[in-house]
Design a protein with these regions (language model features):
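Hydrophobic alpha-helical segments that drive targeting, anchoring, or assembly
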Residues: 2-140
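Long, compositionally biased intrinsically disordered terminal regions
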Residues: 100-196
Length: 196
């Protein structure tokens, strides 16, 4: 995780399901319950695995979310990039990257997340607030905010929880949920095979 990095993953699932998802991963996290979402917040800057798989935010941003936990929305500030990910049902995760110049750009080999995609993802959670599409589109044009301010604005406009966890003002994040050792061993076995 970077010096200024922050991130949250919102899952349309119970907190028990979110805790299980964290335990099957490699990043220690806090899990906060909300009426419509479970909020997953990395508890550390690093995962429990060795480099190059040690950046908690990168791993959370790219982590697969199964259809039982979707829709899922991830919001991350990493170095000079803001990242929004969204996944609904069995569709692939889609990505919006906000570059250093504060413009939304396509990621190489990443399915692009459009305002319409994000709007559909949000609508997939019956507990989510209905947001006019024009408000979602307007977010893509906001270049007056820093990356973290922009991500908090996305959360605010979409009526999502987690803004205080994202900006660092919520200090009561609850216990740290640690990954299961078997999940860590399985991950390390897979990446070991990739690098041999």
């Amino acid at each position: 995780m970077t010096q200024q990095g922050r991130g949250v993953v919102l899952l349309a699932a119970s907190s028990a399901s979110a805790v299980e998802w964290v335990r099957r991963g490699v990043v220690p996290c806090h899990v906060l319950e909300h009426s419509a979402w479970s909020i997953v917040v990395p508890a550390t800057r690093a995962s429990v695995t060795a480099a190059p798989y040690d950046d908690a935010l990168t791993l959370l941003a790219s982590r697969h979310v199964g259809p039982r936990l979707t829709p899922a929305i991830g919001l991350f500030a990493m170095d000079d990039t803001a990242v929004v990910t969204a996944r609904a049902g069995r569709s692939p995760a889609r990505w919006a990257l906000r570059a250093a110049d504060r413009e939304i750009v396509r990621g190489p080999r990443l399915p692009a997340l459009t305002p319409e995609d994000l709007h559909r993802t949000l609508a997939g959670n019956p507990g989510a607030r209905e947001v006019p599409i024009r408000e979602v589109r307007a977010l893509w044009g906001r270049t007056d905010l820093t990356h973290l301010e922009w991500l908090v604005e996305v959360v605010t406009v979409l009526g999502l929880p987690g803004g205080r966890a994202l900006d660092g003002s919520d200090g009561a994040l609850g216990p740290v949920i640690s990954p299961d050792e078997s999940a860590v061993r399985a991950f390390e076995s897979v990446v070991k095979d990739v690098h041999q």
